[in-house]
């Protein structure tokens, strides 16, 4: 499949037409706007309420080589971009060689020994072959290599004949805010539902009815629903995709055992946190794979299986798309507009035809290797970028961060 407009054009037009309330276009360093969905002032990273394009638009001078990306124009998360999976102010875990930050009580940069303000574990973590040592960093080339291996390992993905997609009307990025249904037919003409009898698909589907989409309403799991989370993790860990991912992360000194890895996946993906007031109303899994509604708009919802099932029930109305990826087989990528039972999604990117474990693996890989950053991968010889965000308002374990969101932002450099 091919992009209906050049991706660079889509980027520029998307940024130019991004609504004042949803983008930092022409808003960088403005004062706090209480009426805006997201913020672009200098303190928004501290408060976790930046617009998604804040880092690309407002920190360009600090990151001059940051690639232009196909950006979603909606508020996805209150988690600000972060350089580390950890929020442990008294530790160097995940912080080795970071830039000096006057707000930290101790430091992990190269000059902290000179000034005598290193964290106590600086020497053990940053001076040797520790978890965060610079020589232990995962390179772009390594990410591209392992993502190709994961791509080849996805034997549970849909075959060409398993899905008939009717993408119909392709619009320009300037039209995404119009909320006009330009596609009279459903997106999915046919899906071979035998796919859903496979263990990982079946376990994945069992999770989707465990959530209520409105933020502000607390999530409370039954014993059965908690068991379904364990079943899903157990089933995907049997696949070549997840074995490839774990083997890579183990080799990179991220995890010492599969048990540690699975435990961390459960926390980062299924751990609950609050996107609204005090209620624990959200998780990375719910946001990314099931979808949520906040302030009258769809957020998250980046999964084709969820989309198909909701469309089949008449709850999703496909409106249009602005991007169709270059892959001529599955998985592919589609960036689309749709209405979810009364609520609009302005730009939602999703893999199409991938197995649950494939998406889970790539998003996890990028969150672990490039938390809060753009993650450059390669699939079938085509470049692909994934953006993740960390949840910064609460943590688990020793200051580790939850997943706020993860989604495809580009399939070109």
Curated annotation (Swiss-Prot):
Pfam families: Somatomedin_B, XendoU. Residues 1-18 form the signal peptide. It is found in: Secreted. It catalyses: ribonucleotidyl-uridine-RNA = a 5'-end dephospho-uridine-RNA + a 3'-end 2',3'-cyclophospho-ribonucleotide-RNA. Gene3D superfamilies: 4.10.410.20. Keywords: Disulfide bond, Endonuclease, Hydrolase, Lyase, Manganese, Metal-binding, Nuclease, Repeat, RNA-binding, Secreted, Signal. Its EC number is 3.1.-.-, 4.6.1.-. Residues 20-63, 88-130 form the SMB domain. Monomer. Endoribonuclease that cleaves single-stranded RNAs at 5' of uridylates and releases a product with a 2',3'-cyclic phosphate at the 3'-end. The UU and GU sites are more efficiently cleaved than CU and AU sites. Targets mRNAs to regulate their expression. Belongs to the ENDOU family. This is Uridylate-specific endoribonuclease. It comes from Bos taurus (Bovine). The lineage of its organism: Eukaryota, Metazoa, Chordata, Craniata, Vertebrata. The gene is ENDOU.
């Amino acid at each position: 499949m091919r992009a209906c407009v050049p991706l660079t054009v889509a980027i520029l037009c998307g940024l130019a037409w991004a609504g004042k309330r949803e983008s930092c276009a022409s808003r960088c360093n403005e004062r706090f706007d209480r009426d805006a969905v997201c913020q672009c002032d200098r303190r928004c990273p501290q408060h976790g309420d930046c617009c998604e394009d804040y880092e690309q638009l407002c920190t360009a001078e600090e990151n001059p080589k940051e690639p232009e990306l196909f950006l979603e124009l909606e508020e996805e998360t209150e988690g600000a971009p972060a350089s580390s999976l950890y929020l442990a102010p008294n530790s160097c875990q995940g912080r080795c060689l970071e830039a000096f930050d006057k707000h930290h009580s101790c430091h992990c940069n190269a000059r902290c020994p000179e000034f005598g303000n290193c964290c106590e574990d600086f020497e053990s973590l940053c001076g040797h072959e520790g978890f965060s040592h610079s020589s232990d960093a995962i390179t772009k080339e390594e990410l591209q290599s392992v993502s190709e291996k994961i791509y080849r390992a996805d034997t549970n993905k849909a075959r060409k004949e398993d899905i008939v997609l009717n993408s119909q009307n392709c619009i320009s990025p300037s039209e995404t805010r119009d909320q006009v249904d330009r596609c009279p037919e459903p997106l999915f003409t046919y899906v071979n539902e035998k796919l859903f009898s496979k263990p990982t698909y079946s376990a994945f589907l069992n999770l989707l009815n465990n959530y209520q989409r409105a933020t502000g309403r607390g999530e409370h799991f039954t014993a059965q629903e908690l068991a379904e989370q364990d079943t899903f993790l157990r089933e995907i860990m049997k696949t070549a995709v997840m074995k490839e991912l774990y083997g890579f992360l183990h080799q990179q000194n991220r995890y010492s055992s599969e048990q540690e890895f699975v435990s961390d996946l459960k926390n980062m993906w299924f751990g609950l946190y609050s996107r609204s007031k005090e209620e624990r109303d959200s998780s990375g899994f719910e946001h990314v794979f099931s979808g949520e509604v906040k302030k009258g708009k769809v957020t998250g919802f980046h999964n084709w299986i969820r989309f198909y099932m909701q469309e089949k029930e008449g709850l999703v109305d496909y409106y249009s798309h602005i991007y169709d990826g270059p892959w001529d087989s599955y998985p592919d990528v589609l960036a689309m507009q749709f209405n979810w039972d009364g609520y609009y999604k302005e730009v939602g990117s999703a893999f199409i035809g991938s197995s649950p474990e494939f998406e889970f693996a790539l998003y996890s890989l990028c969150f672990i290797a490039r938390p809060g950053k753009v993650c450059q991968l390669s699939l079938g010889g085509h470049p692909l970028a994934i953006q993740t965000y960390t949840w910064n308002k609460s943590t688990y374990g020793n200051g580790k961060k939850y997943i706020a969101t993860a989604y495809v932002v580009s399939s070109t450099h």
